[in-house]
Structures are given as C-alpha cells and as structure tokens.
Amino acid sequence: MNLRRRMIVGGSLVVLVGLMSMPKLLFGSDQPRAKELIQQACVSCHRLEGAADSRFNLRAPDLIWAGSKYQRPWLIRWLTGKEAPLYVKGYRWDLSEGPMKHPVVTEADANAIADYFEKNNKDPRVQVGAYDVTKVTKFEAAFGGMAYKAHACLGCHTVEENGKLIGGQQSAALERAGQRYNMDWLFRFGLNPQDFVPHSGEFLADATEPQLRAVLGYLAAQGVPDFKYYEPWTAPEFGKASPGRGKVIYKEYCMQCHGATGKGDGPAAANLEPKPAIHANINFGDVPNEYLYNMINHGGAAMGKSANMPYWGLTIGQQGVADVMAYLKATFKGPK
C-alpha cells in the first residue's frame, strides 16, 4: 500500500514539476501550443483518446470527451485552482484515500486548454440540444431529487440539501453539478454510464427517460442558487389556449370520473375512494396556475392527492393541458 501511495503522489509531483518548469512559450492560446502543454502535463494522468475503461485501470478521469462534458467557465476555474476537489476519497480510492492536489495553470493556459478540448475532444454520441436546461421546472427538479434518492445515486455522490452536504463520497461530488456539466453530455451519460466508465461501480438505474430528465433537472440546480426555473403555464401553448378544445378533452378524459357537469358523478366514481373532486364546487379562477398545471400534468399522487387522478401530460400534451385549464377556468366558478 505504501508503494502504491508513493506511486500516486510521485506521479502528481512529476506533473506539477513539469508544469512549473515548462518554457513560457508553451503557454499560448493557439492550438499547437495548447496541444504541447496538454501532452507534457495532462496525458501523464488523463487519457485523451481510446475506448472507455474501468477506473481501476486509469490514473485519473478520462478527458476523451472533455469538450462535450464540461461547462467552459467551470473548466477554467478548475484548471486555475479555484474549484474544490471532485473526488474527496480520491479517484483511485483503492490505492490511496484522500483528494489529490491538481496542478494549476494560468488563466491564459486554461483558456488554451479549453479551446483545444472544444475542438478536438467532442463526443459524437452526445446530441446537442438533447436536454434543454431552460425547460426545467421547480416541480421537475423536486421530483428529480426524490428519484435521485430512490435510484440510490445518493450512495456514491454528494449533493447539497438544506445547506448541508449529504451522500457518499466514493465518486464525483455533485453539489456543484449545475456549474460543471454540459447537460447534453450528462443526459447521454445517464442513459448508460457503462458506456463511459465500465466496471467502475457506476450504477445503471432502472429509470424511465422522464425520471432521468427529472434527475438532471435536480442536478442542474445544484450549485446554482439563482437557478431560473421554467414556468410552463407561461409557454406559447397557454397563450392560445381554447376552452372549446378543452371541453372536448374534458369529455374524452375527465368526464369519466368528474362527470359531465363536474359534479364528481362520472361512471368510474361510484366505487372510488377517495371520491373524485367536484369541479362544480370549485372556483377555478382562484386556483393558482402552477397548482392546476401540476395537478393535471403530473397527477394526483405527485401533488399529495389521490393516485386515481392520472398524470395526463403525456396523453394530452402541453396544448391539451392548456386547453383543459382554460375550460375549467371558463366553466366552473364555484357554488352559486
């Protein structure tokens, strides 16, 4: 074990000494100089090409897909020593537990390296636009937090909750994931982590794609205190909502439980407990759009209500949700 520790520490010192002793002319913003810098410093620990391999065969995380993986501002901060270690127990915790100090470069050099990654280390498997972080809702992020725990992500990755760090420290810390990762890359990673780090203890969860997207929404907000959540009830579909279309959808899907006139007396209602909501007794003009949207789109169980109320969003689409909301607000005004 002592020999292994010396190997890791020694390798890190070699990289650090190499960085400090390189001629100044290597630190430039052009690609040839960046490549030379990377070859002399980074590749002693990181791979920039090759097939995915187990972390137990590596010295540090692969940079094969670094141009797709990291947000540039975070990468610059990391390379200039302004970010905390990602692996509290060490990337190769089987050899030596504890974080390793990463070599630090100047901001100019960091930008040159980032330029090189963006040009030469893109991952062709990553679809640009596969995950739209601007469409993450507060509800989705909250649900993603529950899914994160339900699928055991918390066992290996730390996150921040109520101002405290929780979770295992065996793998990458995720409490600043929203600043670090390109979400298109993280989405592809989440579809099958084994494509990136096989035989490394990474878990392939039995999660649906909507659940994965919710988990990514949760992670997108980690480390971003001013994260701007999307409000779908302000989307274009709601600007052109039609009570007339909503009435048709209400008949097709809602009437079976809530009744033709919203009295909770649809054919399915007789044997249901709890009974369906009586829409005729509700002034939907007073119901907040956020609550009404989430109830229709995500279903009763998600809102702490009856699980007999389905999550209709996948069935009727966002325009359908908007139209039903318009119909409810135009039709039901509460008891007269």
Predicted regions and their residues:
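Bacterial N-terminal signal peptides that target proteins for export
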Residues: 2-14
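Cleavable N-terminal signal peptides
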Residues: 14-16, 25-26
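Conserved N-terminal glycine/acidic-rich loop preference
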Residues: 123-133, 158-177
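Electrostatic cytochrome c docking/interface patches
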Residues: 21-38, 121-149, 223-249
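Extracytoplasmic electron-transfer domains, predominantly the class I c-type cytochrome c fold
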Residues: 44, 49-113, 165-166, 172-220, ...
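Short pre-active-site segment immediately N-terminal to redox-active cysteine/selenocysteine motifs
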Residues: 38-44, 49, 109, 149-155, ...
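Sequence context surrounding c-type heme c attachment/ligation sites in exported
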Residues: 27-43, 56, 72, 141-154, ...
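His/Cys-centered metal/cofactor-coordination and adjacent catalytic loops
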Residues: 60, 120-132, 217-242, 256, ...
